Amino acid sequence: MNLNEKFFQAGANEPENVQDVLVENEKIVWNGKPQKKAFVLNNVLKMLPIAIIWIAFDSFFIAMVAMNFSDLPPVAIPFLCIFFVAHLTPVWVWIYNCATASKRHKNTEYAFTDQRIVVRKGLIAADFKSIWYKDIAAVNLRYGLVDKLVKVGDIYVTSVGKATVLEDLDN
């Protein structure tokens, strides 16, 4: 395996795209991105039912606390505020996923080369994963309701010690 030595030099720029991480004589057979509509929609809908149930449940208790606010001891108020902010974590995670879906889509890229599969993902900085063909144990195709509606699917690649999902690829 020939590695590109320029990435190990001091002050070298980080790779920006899949072409920057190719080894010598490696050729891209196919590259692409997830379908944006499906990617964003899947991120929005993924935790939506849990977030709705969670916010409804907590809203009921927050409303009860608000109606009995004058009867509460002053020491309980900061505790209850911190508790509900922490207890709403699933809602905050869902909001984060919704707010960052477009940026994560922009930074997601897949490439099949003649030697491996390269996956670029990340929100702030790009993270590259390589799956060498010799290490692949299984490949599965899955699609959910949203995937069927927008005619995409997810490819699950299982390799030695890890699994990688290539999300929302066109059929």
Mark where each language-model region is:
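Short, non-transmembrane cytosolic segments of multipass membrane proteins
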Residues: 1-26
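A membrane-cytosol interface segment of integral membrane proteins
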Residues: 2-5, 149-171
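Short amphipathic
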Residues: 27-34
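Surface loops and adjacent helix of pleckstrin homology
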Residues: 33, 122-124, 141-144, 160
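Active-site/binding-pocket entry motifs
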Residues: 35-36, 118, 162-163
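Conserved beta-hairpin
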Residues: 93-140
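Short acidic, Gly/Pro-enriched loop/turn segments at secondary-structure junctions
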Residues: 124-127, 142-154
